[in-house]
């Protein structure tokens, strides 16, 4: 009747204990078995599980691309860009506050419960789009508290992959995100045009429910049981899971600080671009729904190639830091092109460059993961996701304000190509926010130059021992892993032959 969490002296104690007291280990063991049964899922943790979770969640939201533009314009006919930035801004700020906390708690209680929670609350606003637009936008803002699926997913992947495999694994997860956006906007636009927005919302809701069921039934827990406490009743103090305490180490470790500044300066314009770009294509460039869908599909397909085929080759030949620098260079180029471009062909050309810039995030995630110990991956990825959440709050508001200053407003839902729009398209800088974003990314590039190429350290752990102080000592890394290059062998088929404990079953 002993459990794994009992000490060697416990059998002797049970021999002299009363029957009532001796029943306590049985209850604790049965409770632990019951709580762990739903964590098992199918097979060993793999990139397959992470990829399906990401795909379903963002596929559901991708279906709503066209209906969301309609509801946004109908709800806020005046200053649409500005209100869009405000809504996304509140969501991003809440994500910034919650991401380190959720990442730290997932290091203690496991990844699966928080995967379930983040997906559920992130997708909760979907059916509200047809019920009440005001409630829909309100819940989108509040859902930012749990909109940190990527941080939990990357920590999930880090639990079962070796250090030199993670950049490839992160690339596949990010590519799955791009793949979910290849077809879903087109499907959503087709259903909306032929059957109405209500059917699109229904399909998106069903896909979100399918994702939740997949996590419940199929996704196995990736965090080793000996790292987790014996039960959910374990005492977790606020100090152990304080998001601000976990953020304090950013200033104490120079490498982590440089990485975080790089992420902030590079993702700030990217977040603003994501929040307003489809509206910009309609209002300023004159793209219709079909062209927007085709544009998303093209960029998505090219992003998949960039984050799978090219990323592994670049990491092997250039190294982690230089791959990040290359991605930032592509981002500067595409933002400048969007800023000066006023014709449709320029948008298509800049989209190919934008796809190549998508290698930055998985490369940065691999870089921060190398500075975190095995039991601190959730905290490490939570910091990055928290900073991205802050950018999701500031970026859309910044872009919306710049559009407002330059009198770019969504006066009509469809493409507007009349004489009122000609002066803007003929202006020297048709897209001022994008050019401003290129300047910010240039600053990020300069900061990234000072990131060390490789430094093995307990960076995240040594300043965050309070998160795992009550847990058992994590398994030590082997010395061979400490000296091996970043991506010894990134062939995705060979990675799938690893032992179950360190398996990286690629897509």
Curated annotation (Swiss-Prot):
Compositionally biased intervals (Polar residues): 462-473
Q: What Pfam families does this protein's entry cite? A: MFS_1 (PF07690)
State the membrane topology.
Multi-pass membrane protein
Which top-level group of life is the source organism from? Answer: Eukaryota
The cellular component terms of Gene Ontology attached to this UniProt record, alphabetical and capped at eight, are: membrane
Protein family = Belongs to the major facilitator superfamily.
Q: Which UniProt keywords apply?
A: Glycoprotein, Membrane, Transmembrane, Transmembrane helix, Transport
Species this protein is from: Rattus norvegicus
Q: Which residues are glycosylated?
A: 464
Which PANTHER family would you find in this protein's record?
A: HIPPOCAMPUS ABUNDANT TRANSCRIPT-LIKE PROTEIN 1 (PTHR23504:SF32), MAJOR FACILITATOR SUPERFAMILY DOMAIN-CONTAINING PROTEIN 10 (PTHR23504)
Which residue stretches are annotated as topological domain Cytoplasmic? 73-84, 135-136, 192-198, 279-283, 345-347, 411-430
Recorded protein name is: Hippocampus abundant transcript-like protein 1
Residue ranges, Extracellular compartment? 1-51, 106-113, 158-170, 220-257, 305-323, 369-389, 452-507
Report residue spans for region: Disordered.
1-22, 462-483
What parts of the sequence cross the membrane?
52-72, 85-105, 114-134, 137-157, 171-191, 199-219, 258-278, 284-304, 324-344, 348-368, 390-410, 431-451
The answer to keyword Protein biosynthesis applying to this record is: no
What GO molecular-function term can you cite, just one? transmembrane transporter activity
Q: Which InterPro entries has this protein been placed in? A: MFS, MFS_dom, MFS_trans_sf, Sugar_transporter_CS, Tet-R_TetA/multi-R_MdtG-like
Q: Where in the cell is it found?
A: Membrane
């Amino acid at each position: 009747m002993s459990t794994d969490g009992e000490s060697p002296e416990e059998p002797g104690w049970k021999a002299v204990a009363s029957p009532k007291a001796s029943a306590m280990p049985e209850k604790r063991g049965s409770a632990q078995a019951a709580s762990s049964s739903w964590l098992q899922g199918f097979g060993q943790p793999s990139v397959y599980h992470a990829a399906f979770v990401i795909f379903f969640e963002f596929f559901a939201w991708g279906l709503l691309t066209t209906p969301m533009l309609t509801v946004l314009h109908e709800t806020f006919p005046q200053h649409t860009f500005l209100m869009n930035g405000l809504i996304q801004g509140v969501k991003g700020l809440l994500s910034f506050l919650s991401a380190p906390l959720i990442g730290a708690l997932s290091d203690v209680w496991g990844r699966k419960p928080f995967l379930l929670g983040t997906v559920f609350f992130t997708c909760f606003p979907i059916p509200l789009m047809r019920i009440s637009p005001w409630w829909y936008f309100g819940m989108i803002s509040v859902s930012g508290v749990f909109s940190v699926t990527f941080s939990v997913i990357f920590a999930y992947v880090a639990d079962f992959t070796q250090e030199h495999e993670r950049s490839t694994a992160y690339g596949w997860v990010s590519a799955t995100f791009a793949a979910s956006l290849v077809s879903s906007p087109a499907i959503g636009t087709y259903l909306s045009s032929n059957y109405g927005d209500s059917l699109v919302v229904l399909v998106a809701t069903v896909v979100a429910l399918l994702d939740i069921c997949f996590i419940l039934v199929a996704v196995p827990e990736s965090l080793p049981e000996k790292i987790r406490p014996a039960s959910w009743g374990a005492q977790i103090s606020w100090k152990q899971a304080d998001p601000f305490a976990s953020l304090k180490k950013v200033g104490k470790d120079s490498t982590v600080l440089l990485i975080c500044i790089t992420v902030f300066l590079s993702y700030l314009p990217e977040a603003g671009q994501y929040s307003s770009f489809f509206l910009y294509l309609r209002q300023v460039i004159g793209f219709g729904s079909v062209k927007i869908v085709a544009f998303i599909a093209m960029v998505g397909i090219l992003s998949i190639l960039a984050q799978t085929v090219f990323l592994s080759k670049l990491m092997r030949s250039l190294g982690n830091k230089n791959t990040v620098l290359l991605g930032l260079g592509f981002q500067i180029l595409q933002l400048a092109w969007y800023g000066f471009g006023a014709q449709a062909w320029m948008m298509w050309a800049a989209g190919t460059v934008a796809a190549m810039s998508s290698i930055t995030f998985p490369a940065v995630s691999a870089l921060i993961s190398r500075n975190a110990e095995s039991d601190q991956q959730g905290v490490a990825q939570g910091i990055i996701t928290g900073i991205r959440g802050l950018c999701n709050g500031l970026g859309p508001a910044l872009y919306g304000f710049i559009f407002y200053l330059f009198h770019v407003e969504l006066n009509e839902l469809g493409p507007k190509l009349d004489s009122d729009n000609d002066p803007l398209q003929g202006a020297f800088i048709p897209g001022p926010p994008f050019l401003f974003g290129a300047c910010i990314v240039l600053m990020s590039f300069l900061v990234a130059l000072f990131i060390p190429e490789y430094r093995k350290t307990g960076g995240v752990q040594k300043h965050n021992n309070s998160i795992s102080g009550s847990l058992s000592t994590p398994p030590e890394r082997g010395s061979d892993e400490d000296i091996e290059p970043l991506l010894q062998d990134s062939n995705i088929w060979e990675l799938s032959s690893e032992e179950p404990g360190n398996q990286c079953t690629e897509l």
